[in-house]
């Protein structure tokens, strides 16, 4: 804005008005008196304490002596400049005044005088297409105004959009020393809507609320301060309440590796180690049940990879037992050996079980049971819940029941097919092409009396 600075306020009793500017009249009107101009009425008397226009159509004020005033306030609402002309449509920087005490201070502030010459005061005014805020004495305001609902910058212009500011209830004034991104608890980002009004959420009992700005979610507290890091939104119970906001305030979506919230408000034993989290498009974290209560219904597919999340929002890893839906039946899944994997593993491989031993496993490669520990014969070997089933050392062969069928297997887990063999005790078994027992010691028998239950995997515990 175009502003003109004036340093002092005085009264001039001898300001000349050039003949080219003012016209002298014989009767009522302007007359030259020595080096000054006065205004006389029809009776030839000086006019005092009033406004009069000159031939240039500009207003001047005649003081108590009838002289043209300059550099002073008139009626606490108008100002005449050093030329003696009323200030109109302009900014002036003047000593701050206190009309109630008829005092001025050494501090200078900006005032704006309208087309009528009257000082703008007490609220908002649109000047040159921009909004400014003035106090009751007409001084232009900067900083927080109007009950801390709006903010005006150093030039007095109403703030629109984002601004990193000292909190309105703080008294120290060190804005120049703090920059966006600095760790200063007395400063926050605020968002001012197109009306200039600071966004303040209606919380309805919650501590924070999420608000969408230009397609991105942000979180604000009861004072409108933007939040970063972990924020408990208080929308439900458990870890699903949390959102994570980046240093720029934008809600985290997708994968994030970070430490858990410091405030464990839900007694989840979150710890302090870095963990993986996954957030939906609105910032809600993926959360599952306790692992002991997990089922296949809790499996989550993200970018064609299957995960299981626990009640802390972390993807699970290790060898786990899951209920199949609500059937009461259970299946084995392997989610990798560490946090770096934390997703369903398919195919064959060695797996460290919960007791520290390493076993051979097979997890279905495809189909709606992909990743589930396989039960049955695969590539000539017998598996139960994914774990390879072997005859005990020294037995040579054993009958193991899987899926209501009695298979004869070796100590390496290989299924004996279409053969007649004897175990270490001399018991003779005959098997079908599928490896199922058909005779025991020459008698038709499915081997039920000799069969044992399969060895179930030893699952990981947290």
Question: Model regions: which residues?
Answer:
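Extracellular adhesion/carbohydrate-binding repeat motifs centered on closely spaced tryptophans
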Residues: 2-462
């Amino acid at each position: 804005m175009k502003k003109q600075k004036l340093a002092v306020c005085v009264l001039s009793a001898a300001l000349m008005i050039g003949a080219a500017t003012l016209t002298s009249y014989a009767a009522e009107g302007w007359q030259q008196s020595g080096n000054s101009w006065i205004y006389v009425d029809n009776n030839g008397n000086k006019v005092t304490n009033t406004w009069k226009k000159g031939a240039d159509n500009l207003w001047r004020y005649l003081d108590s002596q009838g002289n043209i005033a300059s550099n002073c306030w008139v009626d606490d609402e108008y100002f005449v400049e050093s030329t003696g002309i009323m200030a109109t449509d302009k900014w002036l920087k003047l000593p701050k005044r206190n009309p109630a005490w008829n005092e001025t201070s050494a501090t200078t502030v900006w005032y704006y005088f309208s087309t009528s010459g009257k000082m703008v005061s007490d609220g908002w005014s649109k000047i040159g297409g921009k909004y400014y805020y003035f106090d009751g004495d007409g001084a232009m305001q900067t900083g927080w105004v109007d009950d801390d609902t709006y903010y005006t910058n150093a030039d007095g212009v109403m703030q629109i959009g984002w601004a990193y500011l000292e909190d309105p209830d703080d008294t120290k004034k060190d804005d120049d020393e703090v920059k966006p991104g600095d760790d200063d608890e007395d400063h926050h980002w605020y968002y001012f809507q197109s009306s200039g009004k600071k966004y303040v959420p209606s919380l309805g009992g919650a501590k924070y609320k999420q608000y969408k700005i230009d397609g991105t979610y942000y979180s604000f507290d009861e004072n409108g301060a933007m939040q970063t890091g972990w924020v408990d939104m208080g929308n439900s119970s458990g870890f699903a309440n949390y959102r994570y906001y980046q240093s720029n305030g934008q809600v985290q979506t997708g994968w994030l590796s970070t430490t858990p919230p410091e405030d464990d408000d839900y007694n989840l034993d979150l710890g302090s180690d870095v963990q993986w989290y996954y957030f939906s498009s609105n910032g809600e974290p993926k959360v599952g049940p306790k692992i002991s209560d997990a089922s296949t219904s809790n499996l989550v597919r993200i970018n064609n990879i299957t995960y299981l999340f626990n009640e802390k929002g972390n993807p699970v890893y290790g060898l786990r037992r899951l209920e199949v839906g609500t059937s009461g039946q259970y299946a084995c899944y392997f989610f990798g050996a560490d946090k770096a994997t934390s997703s369903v593993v398919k195919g064959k491989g060695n797996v460290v079980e919960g007791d520290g031993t390493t076993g051979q496993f097979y997890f279905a490669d495809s189909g709606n049971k992909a990743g589930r520990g396989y039960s049955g014969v695969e590539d000539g070997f017998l598996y139960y819940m994914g774990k390879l089933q072997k005859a005990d050392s020294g037995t040579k062969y054993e009958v193991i029941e899987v899926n209501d069928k009695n298979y004869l297997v070796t100590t390496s887990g290989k299924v004996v097919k279409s053969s007649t063999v004897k175990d270490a005790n001399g018991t003779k078994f005959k098997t079908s092409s599928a490896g199922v027992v058909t005779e025991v010691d020459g008698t038709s028998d499915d081997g039920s009396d000799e069969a044992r239950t399969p060895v179930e995997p030893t699952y990981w515990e947290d």
